[in-house]
Amino acid sequence: MAKGTYEGNKTHVNVGTIGHVDHGKTTLTSAITAVSSAMFPATVQKVAYDSVAKASESQGRRDPTKILTIATSHVEYESDNRHYAHVDCPGHADYIKNMITGAAQMDGAILVVSAEDGVMPQTKEHVLLSRQVGVNYIVVFLNKCDKLDDPEMAEIVEAEVIDVLDHYGFDGSKTPIIRGSAIKAIQAIEAGKDPRTDPDCKCILDLLNALDTYIPDPVREVDKDFLMSIEDVYSIPGRGTVVTGRIERGKIEKGNEVEIVGIRPTQKTTCTGVEMFKKEVVGIAGYNVGCLLRGIERKAVERGQVLAKPGTITPHKKFEAEVYILKKEEGGRHSGFVSGYRPQMYFRTTDVTGVINLQGDAQMIMPGDNANLTIELITPIAMEEKQRFAIREGGKTVGNGVVTKNIRII
């Protein structure tokens, strides 16, 4: 299964592409891997457009009965200073909620905007969602600049993007905006050009430099107890079951005992292998890894559970929380709600319906309010105090919360 060992000599950073459908997110993802693999052939593999697209499409066709279907593709690449894990998020409006999990894993995002089309509906939605889920750093790639008849159009679109970033709480004037053509960069690499000197590859080098300099080195909680939210589950013939996800804290290595917590009764097992991009690793906080589990059947584990050091986290259905309900201008509800309200609660990699009950003398919670609430989920999930979550309804985020007290252990 593994093809080598990841040495981890460079700082590891998680990024991803966001933006409107057909603006070139997947093409840019492929272009970055093409340029990076030409510069670092020993450690980076070029990922063709079709491979990135098919990964998203195949995941998008997963079981429709599941609570949350994620259509994303994971690739890796390097700059001179960093190792990047990159998630390519879908841009269709129907998949907008899928970005929550992808975006929640990002230390920064690459916003792709077509210079031909300018800012479009999903451009704004993805920027808003990035702000809501805590992605604090965005780098902009103005794509398809080779197709512009009038160079001034790029100036107009750039100003439009800055306005959108400012509107949603980012500093548009300080945000790096790189102009270029992802497809031209791919064609240059395919023609055997040197990426460090070819003019069509310069935009990708500039983008990598912007990622290196604008997104700060992430602070990882390596010294805490291991916890990884399960994003996907695979069965490998002759080997067993593999669960994948981003390590939230701590570290894991071959031979460690772990528990699978949430949704189902807690199970204890042993991790018999840890890999990242087909390389054996000691998994540490921030890494997207696959963990091979001993004696666990594929059907016995699912997305939304967590893998954790035994005894460090428990499943809960009922809890108290401090929440902020977004105002209409922030993309939230237009009206208030009362006890009995049943939105979706997004915790880590899953969403669960929860029944909200107001506390004290409160009769109604209005947009813009901070409130203490009691929430009961229909399914127990791994939960701990100070854990953050999003409240979603009708395809949009209507509130953000933090767990203040777990009431009942399942």
UniProtKB/Swiss-Prot annotation:
According to UniProt, the reaction catalysed is:
GTP + H2O = GDP + phosphate + H(+)
- The chain's disulfide connectivity reads none
Matching HAMAP family: EF_Tu_B (MF_00118_B)
Where in or outside the cell it occurs: the entry states: Cytoplasm
Q: What name does UniProt use for this protein? A: Elongation factor Tu
Name the enzyme's class: hydrolase
Q: Does the keyword section mention Nucleotide-binding?
A: yes
Q: What is its EC number?
A: 3.6.5.3
What this chain does, per the entry, is described as: GTP hydrolase that promotes the GTP-dependent binding of aminoacyl-tRNA to the A-site of ribosomes during protein biosynthesis.
Q: Where is the tr-type G domain?
A: 10-219
Q: Pfam families of this UniProt entry?
A: GTP_EFTU, GTP_EFTU_D2, GTP_EFTU_D3
An MF annotation (GO) of this entry? GTPase activity
Q: Which gene encodes it?
A: tuf
- Describe the protein's quaternary organization and the partners it interacts with: Monomer.
The UniProt keyword set, sorted, is:
Cytoplasm, Elongation factor, GTP-binding, Hydrolase, Magnesium, Metal-binding, Nucleotide-binding, Protein biosynthesis
| PANTHER family xref list | ELONGATION FACTOR TU, MITOCHONDRIAL (PTHR43721:SF22), ELONGATION FACTOR TU-RELATED (PTHR43721)
Binding residue positions for Mg(2+): T26
Keyword Phosphoprotein in record: no
Main location per the UniProt record: cytoplasm
